[in-house]
Each structure stands twice: as C-alpha cells, then as structure tokens.
Amino acid sequence: MNNTKKLSTNVIVFGALMTALVVILQLMGAFIKFGMFSVSLVLIPIVIGAAVCGSGIGAWLGLVFGAVVLLSGDAGAFLAVNVPGTIITVLLKGVACGFFAGAVYRLVEKYNRYAAVIAAAIVCPLVNTGIFLLGCRLFFMDTVAAWAAAEDFGDNAVRYMFFVLAGGNFLFELCLNIVISPIIFRLLNIRKKQG
C-alpha cells in the first residue's frame, strides 16, 4: 500500500513539474515563429511526461498545452473565424498528441526503450500536426482557401495548409524531438535506476 501511495505522489509531483514546464515553454515558444504560428517546444516535456507517467499524464500535459495556446492568443487567427472549431481543434490535438505519445511508448518499450523514446518523439508532433490539418479541413477550409489565394497558391488550399500553415513548424518540432530523444532516453534510464 505504501509503494502505491509513493508512486502516486511521484507521478503527481512529476506531472506538476512537467505541467509548469509546458506552460513556460509554450509561452517562450511564442517568440519563435514559422509562418503564422509559434513552434511547440512543449512537445518534449509532453513526451517525457507520457513516457514516465503514462498516457493519462501525457493527455493532461497536452490539455495544458492546448489551454495555453488558446489563452495566449496564438490561435487568434482561427478564433476570429470559428470559436468552437478552434477550441475543439486546439484541445483535441494537444490531448491526442500526449495520449498517443504515451501509448506508443508503452507499446514499443516492451521491445526496446530507446526505440520507444524515438517512436513517442515522432508520434507526438505527427498527431499534433495531423489533427491541426484535419481541424483546418473541417472548420476553416473557406478561410484557408482565401489565405491560399492571397499568397499566390491559387485554388490549392491543401498545398497551402501543408507548406505554409504546418510545414515549417512540423519539421522543426519533429527534428527537435528526434535530436532531443537521446537526452530523454538518458533521463528515463536515470529515473528507472532511482525507482
């Protein structure tokens, strides 16, 4: 019983630390922009939290990420068009990227912890960007088409979505996560040795 209580306390404390880190990094990331949007530096603590504490904490950290995006004004261009669509897209992409990072980590960890870290680090930005693009398609396609036409993409709004709205951010986030993966792996090894 005492081990369960200790584990729960450790998970809560670690989750709280990762939550604070998500808030700080998302606010700092607002100063680094590719196109219209700031980069998501928070995907790293989301992956760490999901790997250490599981999909539930990963989903929580993603929810916090989404809430900070909405409250910081980073989603302002979309909020001006469709408030419910923006809230659904932003919160869902955050929760899902954290949840799936944790799920993939747990699935692959059985075979190789290093591969699990890399897989989670890849899945996190992939899910985040994928749901963002799906949200653009479902809720904002007319607006995206107008933006595409204004940027000389003609009637090719999908190409605009991939190359302007998501492209630079996705590549930055994916590369950063992959480069940081060995550090995440070392942190997890230290955590396993202590626990």
Language-model features: locations:
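Internal alpha-helical transmembrane segments of multi-pass membrane proteins
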Residues: L107-G130, G195
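Interfacial aromatic-anchored transmembrane helix boundaries in multi-pass membrane proteins
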Residues: L25-V39, V64-V104
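Hydrophobic transmembrane alpha-helices
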Residues: M1-W60
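Alpha-helical transmembrane segments and their cytosolic interface
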Residues: M1-T19, L107, L138, D152-G195
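Hydrophobic alpha-helical transmembrane segments
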Residues: I12-A16, I44, G58-L63, I87-L92, ...
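Membrane-interfacial segments
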Residues: G29-K33, F37, G76, V104, ...
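Mid-bilayer segments of alpha-helical transmembrane spans in multi-pass integral membrane proteins
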Residues: L91, V95, F99, A103, ...
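Residue-level recognition of pore/gate-forming positions within transmembrane alpha-helices
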Residues: T19-V23, F65-G66, G94, P125, ...
